[in-house]
């Protein structure tokens, strides 16, 4: 066992990694020669390739191998050099797939490039054809120009052609000059066309600006509801708890009326625009007719003057024949002149009538716009006064006092606001209100109030004498209304009594027995 352990230790010592210094632990054994202290200096040793470190350590620095082949065989034999370090997840199959995908992409790119080259070739072929066509056209134009040349030049060219069958450079230069002349003419025509197009564009812009101005004027004229809404939003009133539901109802009705007015304004704007366009077209047609008539008149006058000028020359008179005498010819010419003048006068009259009609249509449209503006201003003023009176806040609002929308005459689809929450009575009540409550029944009070609300704005400050006069004039008893409302309400019988100079109706719920017996 001891021998095996010694061999194993020796094997481990011999099997140290070559190329690295071997460190040995030197232990002093008793009875050996080296039992004493080491006299050699540190770093110096008798054995070559061994270096001492301290008293107990030695480092082996001798060459590990005698040749390169020994080192190769020691480390596992020969192998190929790898230029770069691959990843741990490297796999040959994955690399093949990747290369295949790359090859497929390259093929696709090649196909795309081939298609592009084909398109380029087709474009080149088309350009070549166009160039050939242009050359043919130039040759044809040159031939046409050569036909228009003088006879002397043609003879010279023919003689030169007899001598030289090939085309001469003079001919080519002439053709080129003619082509340049034609190009210059076409360029001039293009410039004229461009100038006309620019002038037309300017006219169109002017017409558009005019239309925008008219639209702005019309919208400013019909901008009533928007201004009313803005004024309502600007009004600031102290908070009143009792008038909140009424304000909400008024706002809802005002919004609905504004929508109706907006629709009416849009329709009126469209009709006005259509009329303006029609009037402009009529004016243009009238101007064109006038221009044509003036041109015809000038032509006829110029023809007459030319005939007068021609009459100054002396031509030999043709032989007279019994079939076409000279007088008949003069009469025919005079009749044709008269008919042409009559036609021109008719055209002028028609043009003037068209202009008058267009002016009348424009005046009617302007009058309608003015009427609409006046109505709008009146509605705004009335609505402002109504809002001021309604938002002042009275001390008392009578029972069964109903409010109706101011725009009920404009928007008929809305129902009257008779089913509204009634406001609560306040503590301070005037003498006028007390007398009205005690002396006048409900039916007699509500009817004149509704009439006054429908006709005009309700009056707030009324004297006692005025109230009594109104009671004398307006209080009436309607028997038919009582018969119709028997199943809903109790019957109230009014009896007229005299208190001095005042006639007051007092309601009596029960009839006296004496009257019933009678």
From Swiss-Prot:
Task: Please verify whether the record's keywords include Coiled coil.
Answer: yes
- Keywords, in A-Z order: Coiled coil
> What Pfam family is a match, any one?
WEMBL
Q: Which stretches of sequence are listed as region Disordered?
A: 303-337
InterPro entries under this entry? Web (IPR008545)
Comp. bias (Basic and acidic residues): 328-337
Positions in coiled-coil regions = 95-141, 188-219, 344-375
Q: Which family does it belong to?
A: Belongs to the WEB family.
Name of the protein this chain belongs to: WEB family protein At2g40480
């Amino acid at each position: 066992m001891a021998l095996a352990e010694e061999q194993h230790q020796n094997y481990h010592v011999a099997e140290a990694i070559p190329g690295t210094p071997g460190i040995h632990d030197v232990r002093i054994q008793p009875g050996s020669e080296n039992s004493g202290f080491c006299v050699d200096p540190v770093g110096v040793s008798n054995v070559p390739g061994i270096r001492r470190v301290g008293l107990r350590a030695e480092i082996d620095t001798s060459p590990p191998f005698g040749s390169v082949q020994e080192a190769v065989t020691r480390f596992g034999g020969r192998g190929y050099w790898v230029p770069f370090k691959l990843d741990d997840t490297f796999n040959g199959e994955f690399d093949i797939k990747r290369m295949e995908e790359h090859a497929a992409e390259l093929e696709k790119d090649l196909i795309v490039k081939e298609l592009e080259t084909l398109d380029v070739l087709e474009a080149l072929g088309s350009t070549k054809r166009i160039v050939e066509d242009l050359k043919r056209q130039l040759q044809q134009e040159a031939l046409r120009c050569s036909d228009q040349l003088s006879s002397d030049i043609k003879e010279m060219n023919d003689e030169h052609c007899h001598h030289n069958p090939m085309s001469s450079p003079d001919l080519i230069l002439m053709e080129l000059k003619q082509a340049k002349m034609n190009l210059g003419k076409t360029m001039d025509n293009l410039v004229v066309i461009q100038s006309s197009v620019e002038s037309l564009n300017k006219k169109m812009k002017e017409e558009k600006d005019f239309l925008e101005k008219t639209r702005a004027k019309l919208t400013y004229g019909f901008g009533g509801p928007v201004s009313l809404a803005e004024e309502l939003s600007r009004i600031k009133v102290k908070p009143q708890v009792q008038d909140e539901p009424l304000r909400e109802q008024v706002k809802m009705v005002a919004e609905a009326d504004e929508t109706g007015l907006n629709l009416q304004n849009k329709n009126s704007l469209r009709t006005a625009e259509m009329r303006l366009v029609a009037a402009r077209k009529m004016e243009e047609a009238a101007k064109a007719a006038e221009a044509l008539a003036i041109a015809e008149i000038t032509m006829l006058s110029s023809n007459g003057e030319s005939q007068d000028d021609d009459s100054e020359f002396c031509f030999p008179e043709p032989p007279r024949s019994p079939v076409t005498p000279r007088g008949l010819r003069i009469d025919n010419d005079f009749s044709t002149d008269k008919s042409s003048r009559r036609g021109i006068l008719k055209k002028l009259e028609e043009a003037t009538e068209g202009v008058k009609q267009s002016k009348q249509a424009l005046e009617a449209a302007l009058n309608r716009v003015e009427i609409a503006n006046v109505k709008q201003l009146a509605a705004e003023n009335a609505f402002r006064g109504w809002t001021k009176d309604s938002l002042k806040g009275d001390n008392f609002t009578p029972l069964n006092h109903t409010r109706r929308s101011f725009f009920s005459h404009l928007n008929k689809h809305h129902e009257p606001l008779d089913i509204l929450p009634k406001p609560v009575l306040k503590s301070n009540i005037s003498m006028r209100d007390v007398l009205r409550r005690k002396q006048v029944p409900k039916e007699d009070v509500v009817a004149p109030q509704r009439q006054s609300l429908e006709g005009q704005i309700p009056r707030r400050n009324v004297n006692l004498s005025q109230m009594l006069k109104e009671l004398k004039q307006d209080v009436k008893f309607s028997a038919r209304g009582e018969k119709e409302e028997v199943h809903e309400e109790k019957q109230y019988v009014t009896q007229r009594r005299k208190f001095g100079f005042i006639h007051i109706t007092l309601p009596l719920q029960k009839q006296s027995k004496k009257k019933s017996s009678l």
